Every structure is written in structure tokens, then in C-alpha cells.
């Protein structure tokens, strides 16, 4: 029993929700409209359809003073067309009909109409619009069917009958079967006579369903079965007919109108050639560049055919025009068409109004629609915006529309259906959201309007075809107006899509996740201590006036590198009278104190001031080392993007990076070509000075990096890693060792010599001796010294280096200095100021910069290691500064936090066991991993040696012993090495000699296939960290570029009602406000998070990771696993063609999906054996749900 739609909790008629004022207003409007619509004698119209076409009809009906009635299925109860009518009634009761079946329930629809006093029924298009039995039932019930007579529908709705009619009228047709065919053998007989290609068409209905082009015998049977199945599913009749397929024809259709007195007029033609799967995608009216004589013949034939059957109401005669401009009749569609809008725009005629008034008895002459009065003006183009994913074969997308903003403006018409924020797009119906029609005085003006309108749309939450439509309308062939019916299939470059960035919604997804689940940044402990605005410092000149820092400083040591080259730079540094400073705040300082977590946005925020305050600095250490992988791994930033932005903001100070020799910035050796490629791109992107080191001081490993930097034309700072205590005669690494190493390095022609004291164990007297000895031996070689202040002697050591002849020493801004970081820049400047070693920096400016970092450190307080002071014990355990804080964190994560003192002692033991090696990344990690292994397993040094053959050592330890990190000075420890390696190989040369060169071109293609685009910088990142890079790219695909998000909101959620700003790019700012966090849904385990974005409320659904729910979702296919076959779209499985264990070949059908009245075959991506079949017939699946696996033979 049909009944008005009711809210579940209240059995109240909809009209009770409309107050008296609105009733009065509606009646007044109806009265005034009726006064201008004398032709209309009826009062109420029902539209037997859904989506946009009922809304279109309701609007005209209201203009004609008709009351309107909508019908809807249970699944459509929230659809917009229900709300646009005066009354709305559900078809049957819940579960009585399928979603599509409800709109095919002719008896039920007629019953609803009778019960509610309907006088006219408009069928729209699709569903029952071409069903003669439905038209008869309407008329038999005493109502008026807005369309042709039932007999006309019978004669023309059947394409075979229409074809026979054309032949009788001497209108040309394409060769085809004389009547409908029901058996495969009949189709086979036709192809035996006429050959291929052919087209199989459903005899009833349209929209491309039940239609297949077949080009060879192998596909014939399957295509016939699919076409008949689709036709039966969509139209209730599986009858098809067959025609010879024309290659590259145009599809031209003529809009017709006929009255009840035998009068027929045409409203000119439309070019509907741009199609996909025989469904129209873009339509143009009138056809551009159609020869006049051809147009006239087509129009004449269309009218002739309509008159021959006394055609009544609106209809469309369709023709194909081949490349010789010969036209062939296809069919007459006895209904209104989706694309009727463009005809309305060029003729000024409301076709729906004409339909209704003709049905009410009006003649064409009464409506002013005689042929001599009908003309066209300008051009109109229509696009159908759908929820389809062009990158996945236009598979329909489903889900919730999170954002919906329409286009508009001069010449833009929108006919919408369920396009609105909050709409749920289901797999049950057609995927169209809105029709966008644009008109202009010329074809080109109309085309440009459509492109502009498409760009103006903002639709989020579901994929749309807008990027494809934009590509299509911008293609030269479309611009020229020369498209044909298979143009989309024949033009693969249309799919080189530039998708919408969807930045705001992706950002909301991240912010929503932080709001629900808190920060997921690894290593973060709690929320920041400081959440206020960071005050930027002012730099004052000698007169106390603020310097203009709106632009960066452009004078510094980098200009010598750029203008004169690395050699001239090295000479200038050596000739400089003072001792220059390298500021490590932008890299090693925050690596040592804040787990390398400082983000790009916070560096850029102080960049201009830095370029002025440190304009005479030797360099800024700001890239490479751990910052490279941490940027991707934990901060979700592109390290190359960081480098580019920093370089632009600081153009005057040389940038220095840390290069791990033959490792690049990775933790193990890579093929040589990967190192050369990396250095070339790093130099191109902004690095000036490459501090090249090897973790074992292996000169062969070091040589790879040095030569790579030379090839990139960068400044080579070849580095000696300092370890131990050279003043202690019992220690392994003495002055002779270091001088011999320097000799080997100098032979490789570096521009600068670096000394890298990773643990801060270079005592002042040792510094004076080492630097002084090198200076004496190499008086023209610039020397740069790096240290950590772990023991508290860093300032003294750096001053000793300066006095012994070093040209540059390292320091960090005061508030980021000391302990495991570098010594204080303020202390060094104060100590050297006014001496012959004066660094030439303005102490007041340096202090001003520090005021910024003092605030910023509080913002990053969740990453503090909570060290309280210097640790002279470093002279014993020799743990590098950068590793010390990480080791503390790792120990706590492994449950060893209470045994920190024991861990430090174990570090000494591990170092001795490994042969007292040089300890810097990655060898320091080897020692650290072995130390934690010893503590967690409660092992002694002797236990490790004795049980080495049975212990499962950490991977890094085995890699070191194997020789993958190079050759240590003094050799590997025996018998530990042999016992631990067991049957693993032992390398006696540098690892790179055993590695095949990377196929960089193949990597680039792989990245492009996986992520849509690829740069050389992407290739370099992948070469260093394949898995980290892929995870980062996937994260960005989900959440977008988070580098623009202020750190306060990156690490913690805002307060409810707090407003904050995010600058996406110059001049584009999002104004955001967290409004509410919804309750937990027990069904989904999600919470709705509500944000206000530029004054507009948006919501995102977030998984609550703390919730415990029964997850009934199907597993998803892993796109990176070629054996896994995923559903290409959401839908219902209508047929299974395989079973577990079956051998299949590439392209064999596995299953058939039906969605949005379309069937799609899931084919085998490669040959192999089927396993793990997870679906059965009748199952509903979502896009990318795992269907089965196919294991390659």
C-alpha cells in the first residue's frame, strides 16, 4: 500500500510540517501562474522517475500552476527530488522492491497516482518511459500519459520496428538483422554474411545498456550474453538486434515535437558524438560544421518519420553520419532526452512545458511552435558530471558527498539531482550528479564557459569525472568540433588527468584524526607546553632601527660559490682572517635534542631573519643525514620540497648537507649510480657544501661520495670521523692514524677538510694537537670542525680549534645548544669577539634569532629527551650526541628505561666486542642495537662470543659483520664474526662493487604508475628509502600536504570553537574552527568531526582507534600485490565464472558485477591459479574489495 513518506518515529502527513503562511504563499503563486496558463485544464502531475529529471519537470509544472507529486524507493528516501515536489510517496513498503524495481512497478505507481488525485503522469527518461504497457495502464486508469501513444511507443520503442519503418519511408539505415534475435546462432549467421565489426543493441531502452561492439569471433558469444543480460536487467526484456558497426561516425539526433493533430516540428539537431560505452558524455547544439545539405536531409527525414506514425509529444530521431557525410537512421527515442537542455538553450523553447501542454490538448500552433518560428541562436554544450573514476575505467564511486559547491554565472545552467553536501551516493542508480549546460554566441565561447564552470565546481567525498571532462573539452579535436563516437576510446591522452588537489578536505581528514585519536607522530610524548603565537624577533641596526627583513639578504659566502666556484670558495675561506661559524640549528641541533622533528614551516618562519643575522656564516647545516628520512617517515614532508623552499628564503648562506659516503643518506651501501644521481639532484635543488664521511673512515667508501660530489660540481668537504681519545696511548685511534687518513683524503682533492666529532669526545688539548698538526702539514687546506657538547667542553674545544688554525667551527643557537647538541653560538662569539679569530657575526642579531628558537623549543617539548645537563661519562661510552637521545627513547620503548645506566655500560661492551669501531650513523646504530640486545638478553661479553653461533643477532649487527658497511680499521673481530655469520658471505671489499646499478628509469616508471607522476627527486628518494617513500606518498594521497599546517595543530587538536588559519599557498588561506566531535557509532567505530571551513560547516568521518567494534568489512586488495584482484567498483556480484584451484589465462572473466544499471566483467590481470575466492553471487562489494588471488604459474 503506497503511503506518504513519514518520519519513522511519527505517523504524520508531510503537509502538517508546512505552516499556514507557506500554504497561503504557495496557493497565491499557483493562482497567479494559472492566470497566465489558460491552456492548462489539469491540476496535478506525477513524475514516474527519480533524480534530476523529476526536479526539471517539477519546476516547469510549477510554472504552469500544476501541483506536483514525487515517488521514491526506500533507498531514495533522502533524495532531493522527493523534497522538490508538493507531495511525495514511497513506492510500496521497505523491502518490497529492489532499488531499480520500485521505479519499474507500473501497477504500484498507477495506484499511487489514483489514490492522490493525479491527472497527468510524466515518465521522464529511462525506467518506464518507453514501456507501452505502462502508458496503456495510465490511460486506462483515466489519466493522461505525457508522451507518445502506446501504439507509437510499440512501433518506435522497438528499434527493429523503427528500422522497418525507416525502410518503408526510404530513409537510409545501417545494414542489420531484419528483426530481433534471441539466439547466439542468429548473431553468428549475421557475422558470417556481413563480417566484423558489429554492434549488438538492446531492442528496448537506451543509455548504452545492453549494447556491445564486437570486433572478432572470439568475443562474440560473451558479448551477446552480456548484452542480453544487461537488457533484461535494465528494461525487463532481453531482446537484441544486430547491425554493422560504422567506424568513426558522428552521432546526430533531431529534437521533435508533435501534437495530437498530426503536426510535427523539429527543434534542430544535437551532436552527441562524444560517448563512452555508447553513453553520451558531452553534447553540443547545433552540430558544429555539419554541412547544410546534410543537416537539411537529416531534419527532413526526422520529420518524415515522425509524421508517418502521427507522432505525439517529444521525441528524438537519431542518426549516424559517416566520414563521407552519409547519414543513417538508428532509432527514434519516444521520450525526452537527458540532453534536451542544450536544445532549449539555443531555441528558447521549454520542451517540458510543451510536452505537458500538448498532453493537455494544446496544438503546436497554440503554443507558437510552427516551423517558421523556430530558429537557433548561438551554441550550447552540456556535460554530465558523474561520480565515476576516470582513472579506473569510469567505475562508479560511492560514498558520502562531504563538500558540494556549484558553478554559476553568465550562460551557465545546472540541472541537478542528488548533488548536495551530505548526499549518500549508492551503487543502485545512475551515477549522474548534475548536468552542466553552457551557452555562448559561438562554439568556442560556449566551450570556454563549460571549462570555467567545471573548474569552479568543488565536489569532495566521492570521485567525479570532472578532471576527465576538463581534459576532454580542452583537447584540440574537441576544440575543432571534429569528434566521433569512439573518440574517447581512440584518444588515450584524454586520461592524462590533472585531478583536483582537494587540499582542504584532506587536511580536515588529518585534523579530524588528531581530534579523535590524538597525534600519531612517533616519539611524541604528550602535547606541547607552549600553544601560543610565536613572536618573531626584530633585528635592529646600529641606530636601533628595525632592519627590513621582508626580503632575504642576498650577500654572503654562497655568492662566491655561485659566481666563482668551489675552488675559489675554498681559497676565500682559507684567506679569511677570522674563524667562521656553521650554524647547526636547522639540522643537527634539533636532531640531537628534539628527535629531528622540527618542521619546514618553522624553519621558513625565521628564514629571512636568519639570512640577515648569519649573512657572514660559513654555512647552515640544514639537510641530509637523518633529516632526510625523518621528513618523510614522521613529518610527512618531502625533503626536496623543504630544500627548495629554504633555498628560496635564504639565498646568501651556503647550505651544507651530511652525506654518508657510499650510503648517500641511507643506512647501507647503495650502487654507485644512485649516489651520483642523488648528489647531482641535491646540488641542483640547493645544496652547496657536501660534508662527506664514512662511518668507518673507510677510504674506499669515502671516495665514492667525494667523486659523486665532484661530478655534481658541489663543494667537497671530505671528513675524518673522530673517535676515542688520541691523547691516550692505549687507544686505537692516535694522531698517526688520523694524519695518515688525512693524507689519503687530500689525495682525492677535496675543497675542505672536515673533522666530525660525533660524540663530543674531542678534548680541547686533543683538538689543538689534531688541528694544529693538520694545519702544519696542509697550510692551504680549509679545516672545518664539528662536535657535540655532550661532556660540556664543546665551547672550549671549538675555541681551541680556532686558535690552532681551523677555518670554521660548529655551533647552535643558545637555546638549542649544549648537552647532545652543539656548543653555544653565543658563548663562542663572546669568547672570540675582538680577537683575530672573530667570526664576524652580530651578537645582538644572533641573540634575537635565539628568542624565536627559545619559544619554538617549547612547542616541540613532546620530543625532548629531558636531559638535565652535560654527561662527561661520554668519554667512556662514546655514544654520539644524535644517537644518545634516540637511544634513551628506544630504551624506554623496549622497556629498558629503568636500565639506562646498564645500557650505557653495554654500549662500551658492544663497542669492544665489535673491535672498537668508529661510531657514527650507521655504525653507531650497530653498537646501540647490540647493546640493547645484550641488556634485554642479560648477556655478558663472553656470552656473546661463546654463543654467537646460536644467537639471533639484530640485523644491523650481521650486516656490519658481513661487510655491508665497509671495512673497519684493524679488521673484523674474530671469532665473533665467523660464528655470528654462520653461512653468510664475508665481503672484503667495499659493498658497492657487489651491487648492480639501479635502473633509475624503471624506478621512475614504477613511481609514475603507482602515484601518477614522478620527478628525478622522487627517484632519488626512492633509491634511498623505497618503503619509506611509498608510505609517505600514500599518506600524502590520503591527507595532502601537511607542511602548510601550523605545528601547534599538527601535534595537537585545537580547542572547541578555536579559530586558526592555514595558508595553502600565497593568497589562499583556510579559516578553520573545530565545532564538535560526535559520539561513537557502534556500527562503524567512527566519530563525525565537524569543522567550519571559511564559514562553511564540513564534517569528516574518523575511525576511533580506541573503539572496539566487530569489523565486518571485506579485506581490500593490495594494489602493490599483483596477485590480488580487487573489485573495480561498488556493486552486486551477479555471476561467478571461476572456483578455487582453476587455472586461468590473462583476460579470462572471473566474475561479473552489476552497479548503477551497468555490468562489468572482472578479468584476470595475468595467467595463474585462482585461490582465496572471497565472494559469491549476490554479494555486495565496495571498490577494491578483495575478490580472489591469482598466483602466477
Swiss-Prot record:
Cofactor(s) annotated in UniProt: biotin; Zn(2+)
Domain Pyruvate carboxyltransferase: 579-847
Domain Biotin carboxylation as annotated: residue spans: 41-493
Positions annotated to bind substrate: 587-591, 660, 921
Modified residues (N6-carboxylysine): 756
All copies of domain Biotinyl-binding, residue ranges: 1116-1191
Binding site residues for ATP: 159, 243, 278
Keyword Cytoplasm: yes
Keyword set includes Ligase: yes
GO function terms (MF aspect): ATP binding; metal ion binding; pyruvate carboxylase activity
Residue ranges of domain ATP-grasp in the record: 163-360
This protein's pathway: Carbohydrate biosynthesis; gluconeogenesis
Superkingdom per UniProt: Eukaryota
SUPFAM superfamilies: Aldolase, Glutathione synthetase ATP-binding domain-like, post-HMGL domain-like, PreATP-grasp domain, Rudiment single hybrid motif, Single hybrid motif
UniProt: a divalent metal cation binding residues: 588, 756, 786, 788
GO cellular component entries: cytoplasm
A biological process term (GO) from this entry: gluconeogenesis
Intracellular or extracellular location(s): Cytoplasm
Modified residues (N6-biotinyllysine): 1157
NCBIfam families recorded: PRK09282.1 (NF006761), PRK12999.1 (NF009554), pyruv_carbox (TIGR01235)
Name recorded for this polypeptide: Pyruvate carboxylase
Taxonomic classification: Eukaryota, Fungi, Dikarya, Ascomycota, Pezizomycotina
Gene field: pyc
Amino acid at each position: 500500500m503506497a503511503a506518504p513518506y513519514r518520519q519513522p518515529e511519527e505517523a504524520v502527513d508531510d503537509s502538517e510540517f508546512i505552516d499556514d503562511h507557506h500554504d497561503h504563499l504557495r496557493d497565491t503563486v499557483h493562482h497567479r501562474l494559472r492566470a497566465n496558463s489558460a491552456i492548462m485544464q489539469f491540476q496535478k502531475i506525477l513524475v514516474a522517475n527519480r533524480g534530476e529529471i523529476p526536479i526539471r519537470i517539477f519546476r516547469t509544472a510549477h510554472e504552469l500552476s500544476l501541483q506536483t507529486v514525487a515517488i521514491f524507493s526506500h533507498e531514495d528516501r533522502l533524495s532531493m527530488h522527493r523534497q522538490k515536489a508538493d507531495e511525495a510517496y514511497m513506492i510500496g513498503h521497505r523491502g518490497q522492491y529492489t532499488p531499480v524495481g520500485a521505479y519499474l512497478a507500473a501497477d504500484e505507481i498507477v495506484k499511487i497516482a489514483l489514490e492522490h488525485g493525479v491527472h497527468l503522469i510524466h515518465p521522464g527518461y529511462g525506467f518506464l518511459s518507453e514501456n507501452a504497457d505502462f502508458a496503456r495502464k495510465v490511460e486506462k486508469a483515466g489519466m493522461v500519459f505525457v508522451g507518445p501513444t502506446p501504439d507509437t511507443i510499440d512501433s518506435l520503442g522497438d528499434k527493429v520496428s523503427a528500422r522497418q519503418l525507416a525502410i518503408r519511408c526510404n530513409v537510409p539505415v545501417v545494414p542489420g538483422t531484419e528483426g530481433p534475435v534471441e539466439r547466439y546462432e542468429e548473431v553468428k549467421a549475421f557475422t558470417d554474411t556481413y563480417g566484423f565489426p558489429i554492434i549488438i543493441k538492446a531492442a528496448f531502452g537506451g543509455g548504452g545498456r545492453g549494447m556491445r561492439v564486437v570486433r572478432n569471433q572470439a568475443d562474440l558469444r560473451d558479448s551477446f550474453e552480456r548484452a542480453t543480460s544487461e537488457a533484461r536487467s535494465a528494461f525487463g526484456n532481453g531482446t537484441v538486434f544486430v547491425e554493422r558497426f560504422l567506424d568513426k561516425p558522428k552521432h546526430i539526433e533531431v529534437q521533435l515535437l508533435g501534437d495530437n493533430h498530426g503536426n510535427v516540428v523539429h527543434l534542430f539537431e544535437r551532436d552527441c558524438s562524444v560517448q563512452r560505452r555508447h553513453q553520451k558524455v558531452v553534447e553540443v547544439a547545433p552540430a558544429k560544421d555539419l554541412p547544410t545539405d546534410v543537416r537539411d536531409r537529416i531534419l527532413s527525414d526526422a520529420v518524415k518519420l515522425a509524421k508517418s506514425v502521427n507522432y505525439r509529444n517529444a521525441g528524438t530521431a537519431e542518426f549516424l553520419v559517416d566520414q563521407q557525410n552519409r547519414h543513417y537512421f538508428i532509432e527514434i527515442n519516444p521520450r525526452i532526452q537527458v540532453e534536451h537542455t542544450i536544445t532549449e538553450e539555443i531555441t528558447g523553447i521549454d520542451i517540458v512545458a510543451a510536452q505537458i501542454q500538448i498532453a493537455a490538448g494544446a496544438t503546436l500552433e497554440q503554443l507558437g511552435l510552427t516551423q517558421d518560428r523556430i530558429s537557433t541562436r548561438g551554441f550550447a554544450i552540456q556535460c554530465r558530471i558523474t561520480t565515476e573514476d576516470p582513472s579506473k575505467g569510469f567505475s562508479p564511486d560511492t560514498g558520502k558527498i562531504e563538500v558540494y559547491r556549484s558553478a554559476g554565472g553568465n550562460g551557465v545552467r545546472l540541472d541537478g539531482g542528488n548533488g548536495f553536501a551530505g548526499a549518500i551516493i549508492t551503487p543502485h542508480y545512475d551515477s549522474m550528479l548534475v548536468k552542466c549546460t553552457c551557452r555562448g554566441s559561438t562554439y568556442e565561447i560556449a566551450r570556454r564557459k563549460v571549462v570555467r564552470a567545471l573548474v569552479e565546481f568543488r565536489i569532495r567525498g566521492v570521485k567525479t569525472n570532472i578532471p576527465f571532462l576538463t581534459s576532454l573539452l580542452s583537447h584540440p579535436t574537441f576544440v575543432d568540433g571534429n569528434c566521433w563516437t569512439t573518440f574517447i576510446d581512440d584518444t588515450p591522452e584524454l586520461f592524462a588527468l590533472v585531478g583536483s588537489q582537494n587540499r582542504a578536505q584532506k587536511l580536515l581528514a588529518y585534523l579530524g584524526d588528531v581530534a579523535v585519536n590524538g597525534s600519531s607522530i612517533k616519539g611524541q610524548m604528550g602535547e606541547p607546553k607552549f600553544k601560543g603565537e610565536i613572536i618573531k624577533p626584530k633585528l635592529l641596526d646600529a641606530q636601533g632601527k628595525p632592519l627590513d627583513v621582508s626580503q632575504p639578504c642576498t650577500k654572503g659566502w654562497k655568492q662566491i660559490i655561485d659566481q666563482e666556484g668551489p675552488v675559489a670558495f675554498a681559497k676565500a675561506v682559507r684567506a679569511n682572517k677570522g674563524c667562521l661559524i656553521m650554524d647547526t640549528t636547522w639540522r643537527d641541533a634539533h636532531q640531537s635534542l628534539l628527535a629531528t622533528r622540527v618542521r619546514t614551516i618553522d624553519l621558513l618562519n625565521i628564514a629571512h631573519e636568519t639570512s640577515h643575522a648569519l649573512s657572514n656564516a660559513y654555512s647552515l647545516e640544514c639537510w641530509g643525514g637523518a633529516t632526510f628520512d625523518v621528513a618523510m617517515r614522521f613529518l610527512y614532508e618531502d625533503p626536496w620540497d623543504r630544500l627548495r623552499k629554504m633555498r628560496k628564503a635564504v639565498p646568501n648562506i651556503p647550505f651544507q648537507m651530511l652525506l654518508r659516503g657510499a650510503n648517500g643518506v641511507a643506512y647501507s651501501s647503495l650502487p654507485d649510480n644512485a649516489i651520483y644521481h642523488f648528489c647531482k639532484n641535491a646540488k641542483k635543488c640547493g645544496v652547496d657544501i657536501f660534508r662527506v664521511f664514512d662511518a668507518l673512515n673507510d677510504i674506499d667508501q669515502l671516495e665514492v661520495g667525494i667523486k659523486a660530489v665532484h661530478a655534481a660540481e658541489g663543494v667537497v668537504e671530505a671528513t675524518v670521523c673522530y673517535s676515542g681519545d688520541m691523547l691516550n696511548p692505549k687507544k686505537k685511534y692516535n694522531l698517526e692514524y688520523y694524519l695518515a687518513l688525512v693524507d689519503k683524503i687530500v689525495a682525492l682533492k677535496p675543497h675542505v677538510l672536515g673533522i666530525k666529532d660525533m660524540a663530543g669526545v674531542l678534548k680541547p688539548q686533543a683538538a689543538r694537537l689534531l688541528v694544529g698538526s693538520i694545519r702544519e702539514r696542509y697550510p692551504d687546506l680549509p679545516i672545518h670542525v664539528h662536535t657535540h657538547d655532550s661532556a660540556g667542553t664543546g665551547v672550549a674545544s671549538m675555541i681551541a680549534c680556532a686558535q690552532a688554525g681551523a677555518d670554521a667551527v660548529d655551533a647552535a643557537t643558545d637555546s638549542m645548544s649544549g648537552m647532545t647538541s652543539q656548543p653555544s653560538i653565543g658563548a663562542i662569539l663572546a669568547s672570540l669577539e675582538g680577537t683575530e679569530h672573530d667570526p664576524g657575526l652580530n651578537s645582538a642579531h644572533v641573540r634575537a634569532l635565539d628568542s624565536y628558537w627559545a619559544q619554538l623549543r617549547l612547542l616541540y617539548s613532546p620530543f625532548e629527551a629531558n636531559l638535565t645537563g652535560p654527561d662527561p661519562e661520554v668519554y667512556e661510552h662514546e655514544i654520539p650526541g644524535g644517537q644518545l637521545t634516540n637511544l634513551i627513547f628506544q630504551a624506554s620503548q623496549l622497556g629498558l628505561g629503568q636500565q639506562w645506566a646498564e645500557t650505557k655500560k653495554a654500549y662500551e661492551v658492544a663497542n669492544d666486542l665489535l673491535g672498537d669501531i668508529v661510531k657514527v650513523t650507521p655504525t653507531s646504530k650497530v653498537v646501540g642495537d647490540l647493546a640493547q640486545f645484550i641488556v634485554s638478553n642479560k648477556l655478558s661479553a663472553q656470552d656473546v662470543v661463546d654463543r654467537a653461533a646460536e644467537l639471533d643477532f639484530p640485523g644491523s649487527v650481521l650486516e656490519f659483520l658481513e661487510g655491508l658497511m665497509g671495512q673497519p680499521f684493524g679488521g673484523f673481530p674474530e671469532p665473533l664474526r665467523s660464528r655470528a655469520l654462520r653461512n653468510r658471505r664475508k665481503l672484503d671489499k667495499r659493498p658497492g662493487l657487489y651491487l648492480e646499478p639501479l635502473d633509475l628509469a624503471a624506478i621512475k616508471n614504477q613511481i609514475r604508475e603507482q602515484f601518477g607522476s614522478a620527478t628525478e627527486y622522487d627517484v632519488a628518494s626512492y633509491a634511498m628509502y623505497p618503503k619509506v617513500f611509498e608510505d609517505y606518498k600514500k599518506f600524502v594521497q590520503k591527507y595532502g600536504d601537511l607542511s602548510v599546517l601550523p605545528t601547534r595543530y599538527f601535534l595537537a587538536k585545537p580547542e572547541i570553537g578555536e579559530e586558526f588559519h592555514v595558508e595553502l599557498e600565497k593568497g589562499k588561506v583556510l579559516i578553520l574552527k573545530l565545532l564538535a566531535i560526535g559520539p561513537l557509532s557502534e556500527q562503524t567505530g567512527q566519530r563525525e568531526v565537524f569543522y567550519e571551513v571559511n564559514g562553511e560547516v564540513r564534517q569528516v568521518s574518523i575511525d576511533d582507534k580506541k573503539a572496539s567494534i566487530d569489523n565486518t568489512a571485506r579485506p581490500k586488495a593490495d594494489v602493490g600485490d599483483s596477485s590480488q584482484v580487487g573489485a573495480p567498483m561498488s556493486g552486486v556480484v551477479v555471476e561467478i565464472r571461476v572456483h578455487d584451484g582453476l587455472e586461468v589465462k590473462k583476460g579470462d572473466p572471473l566474475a561479473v558485477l552489476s552497479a548503477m544499471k551497468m555490468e562489468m566483467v572482472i578479468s584476470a590481470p595475468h595467467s595463474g591459479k585462482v585461490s582465496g575466492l572471497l565472494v559469491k553471487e549476490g554479494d555486495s562489494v565496495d571498490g577494491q574489495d578483495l575478490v580472489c588471488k591469482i598466483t602466477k604459474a
